[in-house]
């Protein structure tokens, strides 16, 4: 009986710990987004900032944009930046971010869909 209670308590504690870690990771991604991406893409991902409108950034809340969103291309763009056909920088490189931070940002963009 004591063993069964101990197992149940351990399982419940593990579930809460996992939920806490996931929540902390989501908070970290939001902070990384706010610090590095929101100036152009907006806190809400709609791209309706002065720079976002000037650069014509995509509305990440749009289902059509989400449907065409490619995680591998987004990862590459975050790491390497993006230039137009005239070699003008449209988005600077964020290669200083870790692979985990970039993966979390891509997941954050996915979470913006309406």
Q: Can you describe what each PLM-predicted range is?
A:
Residues 2-12:
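Bacterial N-terminal signal peptides that target proteins for export
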Residues 10-13, 17-20:
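Sec-dependent N-terminal signal peptides
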Residues 18-34, 48:
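Electrostatic cytochrome c docking/interface patches
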Residues 29-33, 70, 74, 101-102:
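Stable alpha-helical elements in mature extracytoplasmic
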Residues 34-43, 105:
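The canonical Cys-X-X-Cys-His
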Residues 48-59, 63-64, 76-112:
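Axial heme c-ligation environment in periplasmic c-type cytochrome domains
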Residues 67:
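N-terminal glycine-rich dinucleotide-binding loop that anchors FAD/FMN and/or NAD(P) in oxidoreductases
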